[in-house]
Amino acid sequence: MPPAGLRRAAPLTAIALLVLGAPLVLAGEDCLWYLDRNGSWHPGFNCEFFTFCCGTCYHRYCCRDLTLLITERQQKHCLAFSPKTIAGIASAVILFVAVVATTICCFLCSCCYLYRRRQQLQSPFEGQEIPMTGIPVQPVYPYPQDPKAGPAPPQPGFIYPPSGPAPQYPLYPAGPPVYNPAAPPPYMPPQPSYPGA
């Protein structure tokens, strides 16, 4: 059994080691990167042995004064988003959602130009139907070929070569179009929309 004096001295020694050893454990702590009040970025740096990272969220330096110490946990808390950063991120997200919603609406709303364009591209053969009765069709004449030139060389993409020169017939100028004065006009003239016209 140890003497009574040593039993009383042991707790005092442990407390003294804790009080004196705490600065040694905390010494050499690093200062993490930070942004100053102007928004300028400052890289992190190491403090020498027996010095601590001191200062505020916006200004850091190495010192030996424990009252000015800023712990690593406090430094990391300073890195949390500021109100300006949160407002910037929120406005960017809102702007992105607005652009996406506008684009979707323009492709789905019938009053929008992009919707009409998309409908025209999907159905190119649909549209206003114009009756073709009463309009004479002129015959199509082949382009005259020079008999001295010989057959034309085959064009790329065509499988069958030409079968030789086309037979030559006397070319006559096209006559006047067939016109029937008794036929009704190809359209109906509009009726006046007000009486007495």
Curated annotation (Swiss-Prot):
Signal as UniProt keyword: yes
Keywords on record: Membrane, Signal, Transmembrane, Transmembrane helix
Cytoplasmic side stretches: 109-197
Membership in a protein family: Belongs to the shisa family.
UniProt topological domain (Extracellular) ranges: 28-87
Keyword Transmembrane among record annotations: yes
Membrane-spanning intervals of the chain: 88-108
A single GO cellular-component term on record: membrane
Name of protein: Protein shisa-4
Signal peptide range in chain numbering: 1-27
Subcellular location: Membrane
Top-level taxon in the UniProt lineage: Eukaryota
Membrane topology designation: Single-pass type I membrane protein
